[in-house]
Amino acid sequence: MEQKDSRFAVLIDADNVSPKYIKYILDEVSDQGVATYKRIYGDWTDISKKSWKEQLLRYSINPIQQYSNTNGKNSTDSAMIIDAMDILYSGNVEGFCLVSSDSDFTKLAQRLRESGMFVLGMGEQKTPSSFRVACDAFKILEIISQNEDDISPAITAVSENPARYGTSQDETPFHYKQGRNRTDGFPCTDREQ
């Protein structure tokens, strides 16, 4: 399977990402494969979510309504996690793109990887390292939006966890190897050379 044939589920936490990044998120996913699922989770009755409408229509993203049941509790995260597990067990994708700037999806990223899924994480610079290192690759939205054509700096060296990749702190743990892909179509890591 070629890399561009890989099917992805793109799941976005609207509470922790700005709508200005949607184009860049989808461009990055299209470099990896096809966005089979495009879902975004939030309480769409909240006036602060009004700015999302134009982007959702433009990019055909399915908004998933999740009311805030209790003040201070985030039911959006639970809905996104349940959907991710349903998609995982459907067998319809080879990878997930989890977009959030908080650590609530760390365990989900770990679980998806354990099931053999490629996990691409995206978030703002404030994203905690626990979520970053749980993903196979993590891209910082501020960086990819600054220079869409040059994505190499956006693949962050997840240096907080060098042992996972068998590299030292100074090496980039995840990078593309031209002409050397795994059999599943995803780029090799240093460990897989």
Predicted segments with their positions:
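A polyampholytic, Gly/Pro-enriched intrinsically disordered region
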Residues: 62, 86-92, 141-149, 158
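Acidic beta-strand-to-loop metal/phosphate-binding motif
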Residues: 41, 94-101, 108, 112, ...
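Intrinsically disordered, low-complexity glycine/proline-rich and charged
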Residues: 110-153
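Short, ordered loop/turn segments at secondary-structure junctions
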Residues: 14, 68-69, 101, 124-125, ...
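Short, well-ordered alpha-helical microsegments
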Residues: 22, 49, 105-106, 127-129
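Residues at the N-termini of beta-strands
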Residues: 37-39, 95, 137
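Domain-level signal for Mg2+-assisted phosphodiester chemistry and nucleotide/NA-binding surfaces
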Residues: 1-89, 110, 118
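N-terminal regulatory modules in eukaryotic regulatory proteins
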Residues: 154-193
